[in-house]
């Protein structure tokens, strides 16, 4: 379960980073 939480956290951070990059580019 721990690795699932880690993957979930990484996914959220990656999603936020992607959104931030898109907003910056646009």
UniProtKB/Swiss-Prot annotation:
One of its GO terms (cellular component) is extracellular region. Its main location: secreted. GO terms for biological process: defense response to bacterium. The modification Valine amide is found at residue 26. It holds the Pfam family DD_K. InterPro entries: Dermaseptin_dom. It is found in: Secreted. Expressed by the skin glands. It comes from the Eukaryota. Keywords: Amidation, Amphibian defense peptide, Antibiotic, Antimicrobial, Secreted. Belongs to the frog skin active peptide (FSAP) family. Dermaseptin subfamily. Has antimicrobial activity. This is Dermaseptin-J4. It comes from Phasmahyla jandaia (Jandaia leaf frog).
């Amino acid at each position: 379960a721990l690795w699932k939480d880690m993957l979930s956290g990484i996914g959220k951070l990656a999603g936020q980073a992607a959104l931030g990059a898109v907003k910056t580019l646009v």
